[in-house]
Amino acid sequence: MSSQRRNYRFILVVTLFVLASLAVSGRLVYLQVHDHEFLADQGDLRSIRDLPIPVTRGMITDRNGEPLAVSTEVASIWCNPREMAAHLDEVPRLAGALHRPAAALLAQLQANPNKRFLYLERGLSPIEASEVMALGITGVHQIKEYKRFYPSSELTAQLIGLVNIDGRGQEGTELGFNDWLSGKDGVREVAINPRGSLVNSIKVLKTPKASQDVALSIDLRLQFIAYKALEKAVLKFGAHSGSAVLVNPKSGQILAMANFPSYNPNNRASFAPAFMRNRTLTDTFEPGSVIKPFSMSAALASGKFDENSQVSVAPGWMTIDGHTIHDVARRDVLTMTGVLINSSNIGMSKVALQIGPKPILEQLGRVGFGAPLSLGFPGENPGYLPFHEKWSNIATASMSFGYSLAVNTAELAQAYSVFANDGKLVPLSLLRDNPQNQVRQAMDPQIARRIRAMLQTVVEDPKGVVRARVPGYHVAGKSGTARKASGRGYADKSYRSLFVGMAPASDPQLVLAVMIDSPTRIGYFGGLVSAPTFSDIMAGSLRALAIPPDNLQDSPAVADRQHHG
């Protein structure tokens, strides 16, 4: 009897266990079939997720370590709309904290009901984000991000450029060196609690790659000097814009690259497309008379002319292939130095017609015109040199005094560095730590020194470009005034005013190119508009760099002449 009872109890226990197992299995099947979405949501809330490990974008500095672009930590607010679906009554409170209309926020949530990640506001300060998170609204979270800030604002805006909302370079140096600056974000695996908050970090799935800082060759002190001088000139002469490039001819490093007008990259409301491009590199133009020293160097190199060779320029005009060329002032006979002092189109044309187009074209190419500068800057326009299978006389003459070719302002600074550097062409660079290994002889050293001496006379002769002088220093340079093209011809009363020069002329340490676009008041000649701007920038830069003067005995006279004229 006792044996039967034991069997009965055993069968009962087994039966109950089987029934319980069937009940549990049935419930699981039911939940899988009928409550799959509910379980998915709950599993998601108690899930393992992958989150980015953001890398701080590299800093851009000037040559002395002054910050030009830095990233500051900010917070962005995001939500899981599926979590918030049951808490839409909280939208008015959330909208108030985000300073957004409640209706707009509600519409955003309802338009993305199935998303698990939706940005609500980006780039908030940590204090602003903490105020939002203090509301304790289910499904609302914050994430650490970085916002770009530009301490030098308008001074370097076109050079530095800017990033988009995701921190990727969009313009200027930010775009050109984006790979260096951005690094690579990592990825980490994290555990999320039922409220969707981070519980702990489990492991790193992808190690972040650190960003690199970029140290530019720019000197912020000199950039400020150039920018303020351009601002003064553009406002005084009612010009459309102004650009300047200051370089060290020995190293090729660009010390200032300025444009006016500019914009504030920290305030997107101030953005105007016309002011955002770096005009020193993107805008090309016919340079006019600042090309004459290169044509003259070809003439000296031909052996047919020297500094004292004479050419008749009377009666102040000449006709070539049916085209009439004029000089601004009537002269009878000029030396080659006199051709540069008086900026005679007739004299330069007659010289060019004697030596032919080939030596001039080759010389222009050797000093870098028509070729990219390879600065790593997006949007650079290298301009062009003319090419003809058969050169007409007017084509040769026009090229000799700066028409039928196109250059940018930075190219002018690089080309004039050849005169400053005894014929050596050192490619320009925007980086502080960028040793040059492509230096080449672009002009005979003797010819370069002779042209430099002629350009010094252009500035120091009483009939020369006196407004380009700098107290305490010998200056060598050339002005230019170029008519602006319009359709198939040239616009009336629309000019670009230029001056390119170097100092101290005895051993040039700085080369500066200045271009003022479309002056409308007082005058438009390069010697009137751009020469004094050159003087202001060069004088301030020489002082800032403590470059010793080489013309002390003439300082008071120069200062007096500049003050009165």
Swiss-Prot record:
Q: Which GO terms describe its biological process?
A: cell wall organization; division septum assembly; FtsZ-dependent cytokinesis; peptidoglycan biosynthetic process; proteolysis; regulation of cell shape
What turns on expression?
Produced in the stationary phase of growth.
> Which Gene3D superfamilies does this one have?
1.10.150.770, 3.30.450.330, DD-peptidase/beta-lactamase superfamily, Penicillin-binding protein 2a (Domain 2)
Q: Where would you find this protein in the cell?
A: Cell inner membrane
- What HAMAP family does this protein map onto? FtsI_transpept (MF_02080)
| Family designation | Belongs to the transpeptidase family. FtsI subfamily.
The protein depicted here goes by the name Probable peptidoglycan D,D-transpeptidase PbpC
